[in-house]
Amino acid sequence: MEIDLGANAFGIDFHPSTNLVAAGLIDGHLHLYRYDSDSSLVRERKVRAHKESCRAVRFIDDGQRIVTASADCSILATDVETGAQVAHLENAHEDAVNTLINVTETTIASGDDKGCVKIWDTRQRSCSHEFNAHEDYISGMTFASDSMKLVVTSGDGTLSVCNLRTSKVQSQSEFSEDELLSVVIMKNGRKVICGTQNGTLLLYSWGFFKDCSDRFVDLAPNSVDALLKLDEDRLITGCDNGIISLVGILPNRIIQPIGSHDYPIEDLALSHDKKFLGSTAHDSMLKLWNLEEILEGSNVNSGNASGAAEDSDSDNDGMDLDNDPSKSSKGSKRKTKSKANTLNATNNFFADL
């Protein structure tokens, strides 16, 4: 199932309970599509959300609203039913907003092209925390709710851990020779996986963020521009060669290809029932892949190790991380395009705005 959006999309997200998918485009438009198992995508709504590119998009408020982040430095909340503007943080950052994720029911986190991360308190309608650990654009963020820590990756080649309880940057990795482009937490919180520009996956153990404990090189030399966690042992990668793959972590191996685009992958997202994988790329196409059909039988093999992992980590207590070097795709993509991707929110962020 696929549709030509008419322009490149840099962020996508699925509705948390119904068959709707949203896409944020390079021209600032927000598109909303309905899908089902048997027919093509049908556009339900088109909204001019931003003056510049829409870099990130997520459903919040149980799917009642869509939040978008833009190169115009703003964050916008749009009503799903009417398409009306609900709230607008016009100058959320001093630079282009590149990433946005949900943190708690009353806070979200946003990251910009200069490396600044902000935590927004929706009740106070203000920025409650600000972290400036990075020297280049924020490429990805993920939140560890049990410890109230935000894990951040950047084009400067480092990963940081921001403690929301102490309002301090608790840890930061050594500088890598390569940009860190994407991040997920796996193995029940014991491992942090980062995608890099040269295609190496870096595995950090929780609590030991200075250096990586493992590296997986089978995707090289294609930069890993998008990472999506499928479960605690498997993730989905989107690379700049247009290939989408299912990858096992510890043991590290490429399990199987999922699909492809003609151009670099920009963003990946899972439907509410995990039946469909959504993907966007630099070919203006939005594609939905039926994971139930594609992955049938792959669970049986999820314990086999093939593939090349430079270090073999037993995944005991989990505590390392590492970066590899040598390419140029996500960082340059995010900043050059003046539109990037990734937004993650599941609560009532703009409820009080």
Swiss-Prot record:
Highly expressed in roots. Expressed in cotyledons, leaves, buds and flowers. SMART domains: WD40. Keywords: Cytoplasm, Developmental protein, Nucleus, Repeat, WD repeat. Disruption phenotype: Embryonic lethality when homozygous, due to embryo and endosperm developmental arrest at various stages ranging from the zygote stage to the globular stage. Failure in the fusion of the polar cells in embryo sac development. Residues 300-353 are annotated as: Disordered. WD repeats lie at residues 4-43, 49-88, 92-130, 133-172, 175-214, 218-257, 260-299. It comes from the Eukaryota. Residues 339-353 have a biased composition (Low complexity). Residues 310-323 have a biased composition (Acidic residues). Its main location: nucleus. It is found in: Nucleus; Cytoplasm. Pfam families: WDR55. GO terms for cellular component: cytoplasm; nucleus. The keyword Cytoplasm applies. One of its GO terms (biological process) is endosperm development. Belongs to the WD repeat WDR55 family. Interacts with DDB1A. Plants with a weak allele homozygous for WDR55 display pleiotropic phenotypes in the seedling and adult stages. Required for male and female gametogenesis, seed development, and embryo and endosperm development at early stages. Involved in the establishment of bilateral symmetry in the transition from the globular to the heart embryo stage. May act in the frame of a CRL4 complex. Required for proper vegetative growth and organization of the adult plant body. May play a role in hormonal control of plant development. This is WD repeat-containing protein 55. It comes from Arabidopsis thaliana (Mouse-ear cress). The lineage of its organism: Eukaryota, Viridiplantae, Streptophyta, Embryophyta, Tracheophyta. The gene is WDR55.
